[in-house]
UniProtKB/Swiss-Prot annotation:
Keywords: Mitochondrion, Ribonucleoprotein, Ribosomal protein, RNA-binding, Transit peptide. Its main location: mitochondrion. SMART domains: DSRM (SM00358), RIBOc (SM00535). GO terms for biological process: mitochondrial translation; RNA processing. One of its GO terms (cellular component) is mitochondrion. This is Large ribosomal subunit protein mL44. It comes from the Eukaryota. GO terms for molecular function: double-stranded RNA binding; ribonuclease III activity; structural constituent of ribosome. Present with 300 molecules/cell in log phase SD medium. Component of the mitochondrial ribosome (mitoribosome), a dedicated translation machinery responsible for the synthesis of mitochondrial genome-encoded proteins, including at least some of the essential transmembrane subunits of the mitochondrial respiratory chain. The mitoribosomes are attached to the mitochondrial inner membrane and translation products are cotranslationally integrated into the membrane.
Length: 390
């Protein structure tokens, strides 16, 4: 390095000129005697930028798909989009998921596989243009735009009305004296979103979670997509321990519940003329067959007062609480047994560690027997006057 500097100075050149080009030109003939590290450190800034620019372009070119592969992907995407928007019966009938679900639920033959696939397409699968614009790079990789005329929006509304009507009717026929608040709670316990979503999972409805690109790389047939539930959150990446809170129609629970309601509406649509009771039998088998303890839904704030008002409304004698038995009144844990009477008829009984507690439990027992009364099939329908106002 010293010899190089001496020759440069003898030639009338400064060792560190202002021009980077001169310095690089001076040392370039002797660069073969220098280490690569030293040469790179003294090289031109423009040369370094040019090298980085070329390397970046090379890396970008490596990431791009070949034109032929990109054309195949576009063709697959357009075919998938056309299939989802039209749902041809010839393609839907080949779906293993649809055929299995149809057989598992014992759906009528009039309900086609394309209609069943429509029940699994939520309206939220068609995203707004603001958040699904491929030209602006805002498209979701898992979402295929759907036809608004082939989603389950209308079926969901019809199925919700059918469920509300039949479940309410069944509960009132079984418990005609239920208060309105308890009746609404019982209906919600049968057909709430969480319950219907659990039923959908029990039926085996699958959710579409793979991206379109993954389906293309696997060359997945289009009928596989028709047999899965499609909704907004198909396009969101799930992370462990993080739950994204969005609109109700965008959650997986809402989408699963909508699919159940839509299937019920589809059954009614294809069997209403031939067998109008088929959809109600389906609801009884899959919805009303679950056990519900109606007694757990009651909570009385003033049971003795409410019982007195009930007896007055029904024309019964004023209820009277009587101590029937007791044990250990002066001990640490006494027990009192109280019965409540209306004339000579026993309405209810209760126990407790104090007379007040036993009296309240006896009144509660009498109210439960009244509200949870189940008439026999041979009896005339019972019409209750309404809720007791305390």
């Amino acid at each position: 390095m010293g010899i190089v500097l001496k020759r440069a100075i003898a030639a009338g050149m400064k060792p560190f000129p202002n021009s980077t080009w001169h310095w690089s030109r001076t040392i370039r003939p002797f660069s073969q005697h220098l280490s690569s590290t030293c040469f790179l450190q003294q090289s031109s800034r423009f040369t370094s930028k040019r090298y980085l620019h070329l390397s970046t372009l090379t890396q970008q070119e490596k990431r791009f798909l070949p034109e032929s592969e990109l054309a195949k992907y576009k063709e697959y995407y357009q075919g998938l989009k056309s299939t989802v928007n039209e749902i041809p019966e010839s393609v839907a009938s080949k779906s293993p998921s649809l055929r299995t679900l149809h057989k598992r639920l014992q759906l009528p033959n009039e309900l086609t596989y394309s209609t069943l696939s429509r029940c699994l397409t939520c309206p939220s699968a068609k995203l707004p243009d603001k958040i699904n614009n491929p030209t602006k790079g805002a498209a979701f990789v898992n979402t295929v735009p759907t036809n608004k005329y082939l989603d389950n929006h209308g079926l969901n509304i019809m199925g919700k009305n059918l469920l509300s009507y039949h479940v309410t009717k069944s509960i009132i026929q079984k418990y005609p004296r239920l208060p309105t608040v308890v009746l609404n709670a019982a209906v919600n316990a049968y057909i709430s979103e969480a319950v219907l979503a659990h039923i959908a999972k029990y039926w085996g409805i699958e959710v579409e979670t793979t991206s379109v690109l993954s389906r293309y790389l696997k060359m997945e047939p289009f009928e596989f997509t028709l047999g899965r539930l499609k909704f907004f959150n198909n396009s969101l990446n799930s992370k462990d321990g993080i739950e994204l809170i969005t609109g109700k129609n965008f959650s997986e629970t809402s989408a699963l519940a909508m699919s159940v309601r839509s299937i019920i509406a589809a059954i009614w649509a294809v069997t209403e003329q031939k067998d109008s009771q088929a959809v109600y039998r389906f609801i009884d088998d899959h919805i009303m067959s679950r056990k519900l303890d109606i007694t757990k839904m009651f909570q009385f704030e003033q049971p003795t007062r409410e019982l007195a008002m009930l007896c007055r409304r029904e024309g019964l004698e004023k209820p009277v609480s009587k101590l029937v038995a007791e044990s250990g009144r002066l001990s640490k844990s006494p027990v009192f047994i109280v019965h409540v009477f209306s004339g000579e008829e026993t309405l209810g009984e209760g126990y407790g560690s104090s007379l007040k507690e036993a009296k309240a439990r006896a009144a509660t027992d009498a109210l439960m027997k009244w509200y949870c009364y189940e008439p026999l099939a041979q009896q005339e329908p019972v019409i209750d006057p309404g809720t007791v106002v305390v």
